[in-house]
A protein has these predicted regions:
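Cell-envelope/ECM-targeting effectors and their regulatory/trafficking segments
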Residues: 1-117, 254-256
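Second-shell loop/turn segments in exported
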Residues: 3-8, 28-30, 132-143, 182-183, ...
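Active-site acidic/histidine clusters and adjacent loop/turn architecture
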Residues: 101-166
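Active-site-adjacent loop/helix surface patches within enzyme catalytic domains
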Residues: 150-192, 203
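A generic secondary-structure signal for well-formed alpha-helical elements
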Residues: 25, 47, 153-160, 227, ...
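Catalytic cores and adjacent binding grooves of peptidoglycan-active enzymes
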Residues: 181-257
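Surface-exposed patches in mature extracellular/periplasmic domains of secreted proteins
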Residues: 3-6, 29-32, 160-172, 230-235
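Extracytoplasmic/secreted envelope proteins and their assembly/folding machinery
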Residues: 15, 40-43, 146-153, 216, ...
């Protein structure tokens, strides 16, 4: 890729050069050269020495100019697909909940299920169901899960505003079986899971190439840090799906009597 001559400022050409350089060693090039960061360390290896710039007044570059400067073949769309195998370890330290565990701890949300969404009938659980906005969309789900989602979305807004603005919900509370099953109850039935879409596009569940949307892979670590398990790790990959992990649910159980 032809970057062009240096323009003497951290403008579009410089940012394009940085992201092109980063593409050789970073999974997600960001155009940043931070003190002690990996990019500066790599530059040092090739003999780069920072210039003295204390007499230079920095020029402010607009977010739009930065976006246009980053090569499309490096960043691409947030809905572009990346191999699950390229993402490393998923859900470190977290464990998904089973039907047996959920029924033991919270009881059945209702007595009968089908492949279609049906209302929750459990008197115990109904009092903990909440409908509210979590930022980019409104959800209905288990109250502590909804509260947790609000915190997650607030963090995504700060760290990845472009992804935040593209996020939509494909449903949270939905009493039904897992897709393709007539025995396994979906964790959506307890209001403790959510399916996400980006720019209105759903990640295809169990696609032959076992790929996931890039944007979902970026925000998955934030969900993990808040105790949510990413469905991309399921035997049948389900990257649109995020659910409350066992350890997080255990923290809530005393308040869900």
């Amino acid at each position: 890729m032809a970057i062009g001559r240096a323009d003497g400022q951290c403008g579009p050409r410089t940012i394009a050069g940085i992201t092109t350089f980063q593409a050789g060693f970073l999974r997600h090039p960001d155009g940043l050269v931070e003190p002690g960061g990996k990019t500066l360390q790599r530059l040092s290896l090739v003999g780069f020495k920072p210039a003295t710039t204390n007499k230079v007044t920095p020029k402010v570059t607009s977010p739009q100019a930065i976006k246009q400067a980053v090569p499309s073949e490096i960043t691409g769309s947030i809905t572009r697909l990346v191999p699950r195998s390229s993402l490393g370890t998923l859900n470190p330290g977290l464990k998904a909940v089973s039907n047996t565990y959920m029924i033991e701890k919270l009881g059945k949300p209702r007595e009968s299920f089908s492949s279609d969404c049906q209302p929750i009938t459990s008197a115990r659980l109904k009092k903990y169901i909440q409908t509210t906005s979590v930022g980019p969309f409104k959800v209905e789900g288990l109250k502590p899960a909804v509260d947790s989602l609000q915190a997650i979305m607030s963090e995504i807004l700060i760290k990845h505003p472009d992804i935040y603005s593209a996020l939509g919900s494909a449903g949270m509370l939905c009493c039904r079986y897992v897709r393709g099953s007539t025995t396994s109850i979906s964790n959506h039935s307890w209001g403790s899971a959510i399916d996400l879409k980006l720019n209105g596009v759903l990640d295809q569940r169990g696609d032959p190439g076992v790929t996931v949307q890039y944007g979902l892979s970026v925000i998955a670590p934030i969900f993990n840090n808040h105790g949510w398990y990413w469905g991309a790790a399921f035997r049948t990959e389900d990257a649109m799906h995020f659910e409350v992990s066992r350890s997080l649910l255990e923290k809530w159980l005393p308040d869900l009597k």
